[in-house]
């Protein structure tokens, strides 16, 4: 359920401050550590609050606590009359319901059913435990506490460990409306990246000279090596920019999401399964690669899965292989001669002819499936610790030109 909410006036905010006091954390990050929140009330009734950091960090499939505590005069109001409500901010004035509790009655909504519950760590604890975290859980959450007369609320931001990757489909660059960019990311095991995630990726070295949609409807691109074809010698309009020679985020602002077309910047997180490479005795067209993965109880890996395996599981393979969208790519953690450049990254050969061009294939196997048996296909795994099935050291393979 999504609802719009009107802003409270100053009087209402002051009234809330005298009644129910909600504590959440405004800055910083933690990784599942228990929060300690102290509340001190002076004789005059003024309140001094200390809170723990309000940004929590998890990953896909993880379990996280969104911290929230409250305090008020229990003698005047019983705890059974307090309503606790969690919502997710989907737009500046739009919220979707996550969880609500009134006394012993608890209810989770939508995709949060079966995954969300109160921590229940004593009186005044409104913290929410969220299990099996998904990509869609990323974002800001509001914790609201209400008694008979007053209410107060605070925000907690849930961040995810992961990787940002630029994407365009076979049709070429600058072909996606905003809605099409959302679908393209979802098809490649991702979501549209946020501006904060793109900024973090830029700080981590991402350099990409094509503009793409972000989840807030803006269009930006990150430049770490300023050059004239990529917006000149300085960034504009976003953090890290400002026209200096150090690069930054080039920002086109908010664009018409149904008429204008750009690429997409997608975000993905930890893989529940793993990616491995199958190398046939002879390279195969795309249709043969798909059959080979299926024979191993796997599917052709998606672009986001390959990026996650490269970034988070350190998959390093100096051989191009088919991916599910028909592109051919390969992941490099340790740059070396004849492997496509001096920087780590996922190299792309674009979208080769699916019937005439021949490659191996990157496969993705879901959790619980057995390891592939070495045989006619060489194979590797996302841990990057070695290679079986008679595969040669990647550094000795035929050079790839990208």
UniProtKB/Swiss-Prot annotation:
Q: Which cysteines are joined by disulfide bonds?
A: 68-143, 185-266, 209-230, 293-363, 318-339
Expression across tissues is: Expressed predominantly in brain.
From the UniProt record, which GO molecular function terms apply? hyaluronic acid binding; structural constituent of synapse-associated extracellular matrix
Residue runs in coiled coils:
none
Q: Which UniProt keywords apply?
A: Disulfide bond, Extracellular matrix, Glycoprotein, Hyaluronic acid, Immunoglobulin domain, Repeat, Secreted, Signal
Question: Which cellular component terms (GO) are annotated to the entry?
Answer: extracellular space; perineuronal net; synapse
Q: Which GO terms describe its biological process?
A: cell adhesion; central nervous system development; inhibitory synapse assembly; skeletal system development; synaptic transmission, GABAergic
Span of domain Ig-like C2-type: 46-161
Domain Link, by residue range, is 163-268, 273-365
Q: Which InterPro entries match?
A: C-type_lectin-like/link_sf, CTDL_fold, Hyaluronan_bind_Proteoglycan, Ig-like_dom, Ig-like_dom_sf, Ig-like_fold, Ig_sub, Ig_sub2
Tell me where it resides.
Answer: Secreted, Extracellular space, Extracellular matrix
* Signal peptide range: 1-29
Principal localization reads: secreted
State the similarity comment: Belongs to the HAPLN family.
Biological function:
Essential for the proper localization of brevican (BCAN), mainly as a perineuronal nets (PNNs)-type deposition in the brainstem and cerebellum thereby playing a key role in the formation and structural organization of PNNs. Contributes to the formation and transmission of inhibitory GABAergic synapses between Purkinje cells and deep cerebellar nuclei neurons.
Q: What is this protein called?
A: Hyaluronan and proteoglycan link protein 4
Which organism does this record belong to? Answer: Homo sapiens (Human)
């Amino acid at each position: 359920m999504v609802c719009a909410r009107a802003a409270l006036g100053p009087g209402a905010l002051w009234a809330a401050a005298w009644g129910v006091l909600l504590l959440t954390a405004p800055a910083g990050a933690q990784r599942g550590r228990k929060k300690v929140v102290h509340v001190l009330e002076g004789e005059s009734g003024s309140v001094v609050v200390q809170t723990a950091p309000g940004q929590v960090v998890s990953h896909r499939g993880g379990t996280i606590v969104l911290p929230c505590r409250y305090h008020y005069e229990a003698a005047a109001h019983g705890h059974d009359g307090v309503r606790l409500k969690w919502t997710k901010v989907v737009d500046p004035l739009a919220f979707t319901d996550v969880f609500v509790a009134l006394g012993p009655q608890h209810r989770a909504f939508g995709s949060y059913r079966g995954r969300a519950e109160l921590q229940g760590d004593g009186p005044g604890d409104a913290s929410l435990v969220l299990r099996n975290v998904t990509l869609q859980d990323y974002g800001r959450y509001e914790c609201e506490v209400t008694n008979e007369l007053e209410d107060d609320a605070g925000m907690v931001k849930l961040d995810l460990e992961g990787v940002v990757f630029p994407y365009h489909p076979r049709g070429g660059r600058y072909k996606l409306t905003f809605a099409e960019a959302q679908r393209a990311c979802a098809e490649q095991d991702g979501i549209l990246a946020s501006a904060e995630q793109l900024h973090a990726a830029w700080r981590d070295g991402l350099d990409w000279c094509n503009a793409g949609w972000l989840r807030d409807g803006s269009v930006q691109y990150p430049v770490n090596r300023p050059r004239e074809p990529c917006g000149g010698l300085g960034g504009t309009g976003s953090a890290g920019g400002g026209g200096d020679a150090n690069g930054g985020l080039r920002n086109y602002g908010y664009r018409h999401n149904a008429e204008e077309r750009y690429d997409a910047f997608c975000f993905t997180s930890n893989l529940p399964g793993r990616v491995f490479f199958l190398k046939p005795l002879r390279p195969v067209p795309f249709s043969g690669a798909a059959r080979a993965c299926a024979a191993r109880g796997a599917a052709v890996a998606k672009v986001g899965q390959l990026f996650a395996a490269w970034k988070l599981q350190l998959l390093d393979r100096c051989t191009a292989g088919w991916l599910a969208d028909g592109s051919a790519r390969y992941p490099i953690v340790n740059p070396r001669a004849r492997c496509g450049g001096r920087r780590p990254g996922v190299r792309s050969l674009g979208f080769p002819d699916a019937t005439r061009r021949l490659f191996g294939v990157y496969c993705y196997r879901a959790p619980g499936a057995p390891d592939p048996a070495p045989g006619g296909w060489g194979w590797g795994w996302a841990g990057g610790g070695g290679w079986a099935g008679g595969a040669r050291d990647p550094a000795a393979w035929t050079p790839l030109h990208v």
